[in-house]
Design a protein with these regions (language model features):
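Non-transmembrane, membrane-proximal soluble domains of secreted or membrane proteins
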Residues: 1-117, 126-132, 149-156, 160-163, ...
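Short, cysteine/histidine-rich loop/knuckle motifs that typically chelate Zn2+
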Residues: 68, 120, 139
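Sec-exported extracytoplasmic/periplasmic mature domains
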Residues: 94, 114-119, 123, 142, ...
Length: 195
């Protein structure tokens, strides 16, 4: 399962330990995956896969951060690891495997997404969007935060993020979208359906 900034893992079985294997990739620069209450730091080098194992013993939300200076947005490169019971985790996996739901009311927003630069970087399962540089947005609105943890995931913050990402996360590589208000409303409405 590919995620961005929010990782869901199952609770390890205390009788028969079941650690979780995590494959780590970086597309842009050196990073270091660090969630202090779960594991030590693991470095990421662009275009080289690295991996780690974690063996969580308690459910909850564990906070982490990139531990390698990686540019102007480094201080806002936050992450969350959700340790869930096996049943909760299995339900989350099932939901993540579903294609994005789109209805006619938001089809204009989907067209905007697929005809602007969004499609070059982002993936939305079940659509023609299969970019690999930015986060997979298939279930964007199931996340608590956007912009690597820089802002709560609300339609208002999403709108601000689309209009000018650098106001939310200085140094962001995402370009500002030059959309009129109607296009911005439609794109935000479309993204809000990706749950």
């Amino acid at each position: 399962m590919v995620t961005a900034n929010e990782l869901h893992v199952p609770l390890s079985d205390p009788v028969h330990p079941t650690p979780t294997f995590i494959k780590l990739l970086s597309a842009d620069t050196d990073h270091s995956f660090w969630v202090p209450r779960l594991a030590g730091k693991t470095d990421l080098i662009p275009n080289h896969a690295n991996s780690m194992w974690i063996d969580p013993q308690e459910t909850g939300v564990y906070l982490g951060q990139c531990a390698q200076y990686c540019g102007t947005q480094h201080a806002k490169m936050l992450l969350r690891v959700y340790v869930q019971s096996r049943d909760e985790f299995d339900r989350w996996i099932q939901q993540q495997r579903q294609p994005a739901f789109v209805n006619d009311a938001v089809s204009q927003g989907q067209r905007i997404f697929e005809t602007t630069s969004c499609i070059n970087c982002h993936t939305v399962s079940g659509t023609v969007a299969n970019g690999r540089f930015g986060p997979d947005l298939t279930h964007l609105m199931s996340r608590d935060t956007i912009a690597a943890g820089a802002a709560p995931n609300t339609p208002e913050n999403l709108r601000l993020w689309i209009r000018n990402p650098n106001t939310v996360k200085p140094g962001s590589l995402m370009p500002a979208m030059e959309l009129n208000e109607q296009e911005l409303d439609a794109l935000t409405a479309y993204l809000d359906t990706l749950r």
